[in-house]
């Protein structure tokens, strides 16, 4: 991960990876500049773009909930480090340093508009990915995939990461061929990534926030029709495997941490 570089103008500021600092400018945050295609999933507006730094996703921040109608894409200005894109950029940098499966942050920008600001974030595209929501809609999710989703969420929780909007649209799945030694054919495994860390943060390990996070994910799955064949079927074939993967991963992480710490003095 390269050092982040801050570039400022009269009304805006850009925080970017040092490797692209000489190239990135305000035009990088204009979808029309890239003739971009809309990307499904997550909050706000997102476009798939091809930049000199490679394929990326450009996201324009938009409010949700009751304030969306009143303020749209405007946020109250306080100071630069508290802006949505700068906070998310820094968090993604930290999560990448922890080797967690998140998009690589490329550049973040805010633009001052009176007492408000508007914001954008550019992250590297995770190629060949589908959202968990898309898999649910196509009824293409099995127990093994849900176990991997649970195990991945467990890694974030063990690292004290609270995801502000953990839902099926913000879980990306990538099928990767995995060749077993001496095997005649390839078998596919699924890699799981989490995206959209707007308002997310590192929290103290104590508390019930991990269970609240999981409950939010469960509600999103039910809202998407994952229990179309009945909630018992959903629990048995999808949710229980997710919980099993989560529990097994947490236990393994705790065991590894205890072994690394060594015996008590």
Labelled PLM ranges:
Residues 1-36:
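Juxta-kinase regulatory segment immediately upstream of eukaryotic protein kinase catalytic domains
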Residues 23-130, 154, 158:
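Conserved ATP-binding subdomain of kinase catalytic cores across diverse folds
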Residues 87, 148, 216:
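Charged catalytic carboxylate motif
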Residues 91-101, 132-169:
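Conserved kinase catalytic-core helix
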Residues 113-115, 183-184, 206:
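Short glycine-biased active-site loop of nucleotidyltransferases that positions the nucleotide triphosphate
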Residues 117-124, 162, 169, 190-193:
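Conserved active-site beta-strand-loop modules that form the wall/rim of enzyme catalytic pockets
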Residues 170-195:
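Conserved protein kinase catalytic/activation segment
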Residues 186-265:
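C-lobe/activation-segment region of protein kinase-like
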């Amino acid at each position: 991960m390269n050092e982040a570089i801050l570039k400022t103008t009269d009304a805006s500021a850009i925080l970017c990876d040092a490797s692209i600092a000489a190239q990135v400018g305000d035009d990088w945050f204009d979808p029309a500049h890239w003739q971009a295609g809309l990307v499904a999933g997550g909050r706000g507006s997102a476009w798939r773009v091809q930049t000199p730094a490679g394929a990326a996703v450009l996201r324009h921040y938009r409010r949700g909930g009751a304030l969306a109608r009143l303020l749209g894409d405007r946020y109250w200005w306080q100071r630069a480090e508290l802006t949505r894109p700068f906070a998310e950029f820094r968090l993604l940098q930290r999560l990448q340093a922890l080797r967690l499966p998140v998009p690589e942050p490329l550049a973040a920008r805010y633009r001052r508009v009176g007492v408000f600001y508007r914001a954008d974030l550019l992250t590297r595209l995770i190629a060949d990915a589908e959202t968990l929501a898309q898999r649910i809609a196509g009824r293409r999710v099995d127990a093994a995939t849900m176990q991997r989703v649970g195990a991945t969420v467990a890694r974030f929780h063990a690292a004290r990461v609270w995801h502000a909007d953990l839902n099926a649209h913000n879980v990306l799945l990538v099928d990767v061929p995995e060749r077993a030694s001496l095997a005649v054919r390839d078998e596919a495994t699924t890699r799981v990534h989490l995206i959209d860390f707007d308002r997310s943060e590192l929290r103290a390990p104590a508390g019930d926030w991990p269970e609240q996070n999981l409950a939010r994910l469960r509600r999103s799955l039910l809202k998407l029709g994952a229990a179309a064949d009945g909630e018992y079927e959903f629990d048995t074939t999808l949710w229980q495997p997710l919980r099993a993967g989560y529990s097994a991963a947490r236990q393994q992480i705790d065991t590894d941490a205890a072994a690394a710490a060594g015996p008590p003095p």
